[in-house]
Amino acid sequence: MKGCLATMDKELWIERANDSLVKHFYEQQSDIEQREGFESKLTFGTAGIRGKFGLGEGRLNKFTIEKLALGLARYLNAQTNSPTIVIHYDIRHLSTEFAQIIANVLANHQITVYLPDTYKTTPELSFAVRNLNTTAGIMITASHNPKDYNGIKVYGSDGAQLSTDASELASRYIEEVGDPLQIDIPISKQNTSYIKPFPKSVTDDYMKHIQNMIGYIPKSDLQVVFTSLHGTSVPIVPELLKSLNFNQFNLVDAQCKPDPNFSSVQSANPEDHRAFDQAVELANKSHADLLISTDPDADRLGIAERDAHGHITYFNGNQIGALLLNYRIQQTSQLRHRLMIQSIVSSELTKSLARYNNVKYKEVLTGFKFIAQEIRQLDDHQNMIFAFEESYGFLSEPFVRDKDAVQIVPLIIKYASELKLYGKTLKDELEQIYQTVGRHEDTLFSHTLEGLEGKKKIESIMTHFRSNPPQEIQGLKVKAIEDYLTSEVYHLDKDTTSQINSSKSNVIRVLFDEGFIALRPSGTEPKIKLYVSLKCPDFDDVAQKINAMIFS
């Protein structure tokens, strides 16, 4: 009977394909991909929803977007009288159409919607929520995912992504909508009056906040190459740099045009060195010093440096974090009660640097909303000078409550320009940090373990660490094991336990005098990540051996 219902369901969807906005994508998919759309369901989680285009409740299409919008409308109206919302969208396929659908549904429920007439960045959305004092915000993006993906992120009134509790409540309202093919949403001219133009003054205010943060960029002969990887950071980043009187940059023209197919990049992810290939070519031609890339929604940023001999140095997220923290420490030397916030899987290097400079630090679960939560809870006398995640997400000043590559681009240029005046590079500065606090190094291993066997393997690894805590790993003596699922720390050296004041998450962190390793399974994919952050000789060899020991 279940099979018959599934077949009927599929037939109903196919009958509505012409109205779905995604018929073309569906027709390009394999039989397996098509079937997945009917056999799965998109779920609204702590990061909203993200998925492929296609037919069925497991895919993004006109009907599943209407369901999401209707659930969010009911959720918002249950939270407050006369709710307001701002919607931004990136350059991806159907981002504009999804934004209009959501705006129409919300307006139909007497929710005032601010909707721009062009694409915007994710940090601009976070800023706009705060600037316009709206109840919520929606960002339509799938970050650096492939071209056949899109997604919806929902933000609260503080400009941060919804908390876990709020996400769960919104999810219940969405699920209560039921079958998306049965939704009937009449659009009246009276209700479309709730859709307002997005005020240009908000973008101007955002630019002013960054201009005030940067001040000025000192004159040097620093040359920069910038690529938006076909995303949203052009034109805002070039306009921002020019407003700061910095004109010594070249754009990778082919990649600085919005393109939902990401035609000229192998990867639209600044973590991936391949994302810099065309930037490197241009840097070699123009003899540039600094290469910067942002991901498609401009919340994350990667950098590389070219020396006088044409050698390219790529910096990982932890190294960029250390450089930016070092610079912010220099910039804020007059402030008291300084604070840095980072995720629990980010480097020991930044913590050591903070300690050395008498800057307090806090660690939070992965996900920038947890950093935003800490910012929200700060006392008036505390000064948050920097926050970051090792996955290339950084925030210098909290007028935005999400990762913000737009504010970081001029900051890193200012830093590099100052160094250039003294004949130094970012690589030199990183080496100086290592000499000051020790050579803490980091690497990440990501394992995809498919199917039931893969799931069992992941569970077995996590269970083993919980029930049989190791005394040592590759000659490194274990001090403590932090289990974020039980919110407990087991101190092996004292044979005692203590509590972690944190939300629960399926993460285990093993602490040594030399640093830590962390294990973190994905909640949505058949993946598990191993983070290694250590100060030890032969780091690469030790990290490889730890990885082999755990996953052999």
Swiss-Prot record:
EC number(s) stated in the UniProt entry for this protein: 5.4.2.2
Matches recorded under InterPro entries: A-D-PHexomutase_a/b/a-I, A-D-PHexomutase_a/b/a-I/II/III, A-D-PHexomutase_a/b/a-II, A-D-PHexomutase_a/b/a-III, A-D-PHexomutase_C, A-D-PHexomutase_C_sf, A-D-PHexomutase_CS, Alpha-D-phosphohexomutase_SF
Cofactor entry: Mg(2+)
Catalytic activity: alpha-D-glucose 1-phosphate = alpha-D-glucose 6-phosphate
UniProt pathway: Glycolipid metabolism; diglucosyl-diacylglycerol biosynthesis
Keyword Magnesium carried by entry: yes
Cofactor binding mode and count: Binds 1 Mg(2+) ion per subunit.
Annotated binding of Mg(2+), by residue: S143, D295, D297, D299
The keyword Magnesium is annotated on this UniProt entry: yes
Pfam families in UniProt: PGM_PMM_I, PGM_PMM_II, PGM_PMM_III, PGM_PMM_IV
GO BP, one annotated term: glucose metabolic process
Active site per UniProt: S143
Keywords of the record: Carbohydrate metabolism, Glucose metabolism, Isomerase, Magnesium, Metal-binding, Phosphoprotein
Function summary: Catalyzes the interconversion between glucose-6-phosphate and alpha-glucose-1-phosphate. This is the first step in the biosynthesis of diglucosyl-diacylglycerol (Glc2-DAG), i.e. the predominant glycolipid found in the S.aureus membrane, which is also used as a membrane anchor for lipoteichoic acid (LTA).
Protein name (Swiss-Prot/TrEMBL): Phosphoglucomutase
Source organism phylogeny: Bacteria, Bacillati, Bacillota, Bacilli, Bacillales
